[in-house]
Amino acid sequence: MIKFVGNPRLVSCCEVSSVAEAVEYCESKSILGVDTETTGLNFMEETMTMLQIGDGDVQFVIDTRAVDISPMRKVLESKDIIKILHNVKFDYKFLRKSGIRLENVWDTMLASQVLNCGKKASHSLANLVSGHLHIEMSKDVRTTFIGHTGEFTESQIVYGAKDVEYLLQLQAIQVKLVEELDMVMLMQLENDAALAYGDIEFNGIGLNIPVWKELSATAEKQRVEMELKLDNFIATKPSLSAFNMSSFQTDMFIEDTEIRKIDVKWTSPKQVLEVFNTYGIDVEDVNANTLHVFRKDEFIDLYIKYKEQAKLSTSYGDKFLNNVDSDGRVRTSFKQILNTGRIASSGPNMQQIPANNDYRNCFIAGEDDWVFVSSDYSSQELAIIATGSKDPVWLAALTEGKDLHSVCAELVYGEQWKDSAEEDCAYYVYSTEANVMSYKKDSNGVDVRCYPKQKCNCPAHKKLRTNVKSINFGLAYGMGPNKLADTLLITERAAEKLIKDYFKAFPSIENFLRNLGLYGLQTGHIKTFAPYRRMRWFPEWKGYNTSQKDKGKIERASKNTPIQGSGADMCKSALVMVRDHIHHNKLPVKIVMTVHDQIDTIVHKDYADTWKYTLQDIMGASTLDIIPSGLLKADTNVSETWEK
């Protein structure tokens, strides 16, 4: 039964009701379908026009332009009633604009993504309704809500009510599938995390526009300078003379050295490829991965640096300011579930903001007397590998605060590492200063001095440490000899030897990764660590008939997904705990960003120091489900601007 709350003249297709009746009815239910219709997609510029809520028996369709929906808060914010939505972040932001927070939700879109992680599938409501319920939703009616300003038609009211029915039917099917795959905890995590991401998208992050414009101007100037360096390189090479301009226009206001005399558009991959082929570099494209192996060549190195600078100038130049909303804040949009369980952001991509603080510091709290309190995990993926492999060296190094990369380098390189130590090497030096000197018990329980094994500045050690560090972090991405060779600019044979020596020193890590790879090859899927056990499917898996190429892809993904995915599960758990703590205690704190394993909040400065320690405790507590030893710690800082 449809009950309409709005203009009483529209009664031919349904009963007329009130918000009070809707609240009374919905309060008595344990599960409800919820949907909204809006005039557009951007909550900052558009408005909510319809709220639909109900169960399989009664659906209330409320014209939010005509009535006050604030009484619905007690239903929508109740933690005792499950609210089913599709793409909850979208509806949540419009509801928050109306002063209502959501709690205890089930997102049918996220459920589909969880169940089909790794597979190519559409997660739209229309496709799910068609696939599971065998009902075709009307596209014609769906599009009529955009920009709609008049009274609702009967077809629009019926369409809105049907959405509620479909959501309830879909969720009933999804619950069974989630239970069969033992992903109930994961689904709860994703549903709760969606509200935290919704808060971030709603809150936005402030931007210091004048400082950003200064950076943009500097970046563009440097791009032009690098463009001229590329031109000058061509001008000195007779073999590339075909790319010289036959004539060029001078300008009395521009220095001759600043006038381009080379007929190459460096932003055109096609033209650049022609230049490289003429130069003698035989490649099929000019992508960074392709060119990296040739980086020792001065010309290629210069071009790669130019591309990096050009990206700063274009992606993070004046064009970026188009992302600033009317309130001076930047709002991104999160894609919550990638194949590994990690997130991505777009419009703009905040995860790709240059890590250096020149750019990060342009982002501000944007509220008087508010500051940033940010927290990130220290060596999160390394701690996950140590926990999964139970490697004694890794566990000891991380537990005792030693520099893991240096410890690994010592074991991999042996005598070469020892012979490369300088006289004042911080890895070996004895000292009575705190954090430099350390003690341990011998077999008789007596304190003995031991090397602090901290990162040092010895030139040779730096190189050896970098080599091993590349492997340590590369483990999380399934790095092989080819990639390692490209990264370190060494031969593939040298990379193979380095990896062999590495696994000889750390057999437990080799076994851990091998077993992950075998599991994926044998089952066609891989899981993250307990308790969430996120499942990633491999559609290309065909048992014994899987091609060698696909076997390689599956093996690599099986090694990195549990590491990256468990890290993602941990970060989402932290976000949920932070959000719950803020709301439960009504704190003057807002979550404004999350990038990789970092959570960024803004807080009134009078509460900043207190919140710093609270946030650090929450970040630590959120790791214990996955790393019960408490091995992983968080670094938390207070700052005036956003920092790495």
Task: For every predicted segment, state its role.
Residues 202, 330, 335, 416-418, ...:
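Conserved catalytic core of nucleic-acid polymerases
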Residues 611-619:
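Short amphipathic alpha-helices in soluble, non-transmembrane regions
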Residues 2-13, 42-179, 187-191, 197, ...:
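Active-site-proximal helix-loop-helix substrate-binding element of RNase H-like nuclease domains
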Residues 31-44, 377-384:
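Short acidic, Gly/Ser-rich segments with clustered Asp/Glu that frequently serve as metal-coordination loops
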Residues 1-14, 36-37, 164, 168-358, ...:
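Conserved "right-hand" nucleotidyltransferase catalytic core of DNA-directed polymerases
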Residues 32-34, 85, 105-106, 372-376:
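Short hydrophobic beta-strand that contains or immediately precedes a catalytic carboxylate
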Residues 16-30, 74-77, 355-371, 583-584:
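A short acidic-Thr-Gly-centered motif at the start of a beta-strand
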Residues 291, 316, 320-325, 338, ...:
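Short, contiguous acidic/charged loop-to-helix segments that flank catalytic cores in large enzymes
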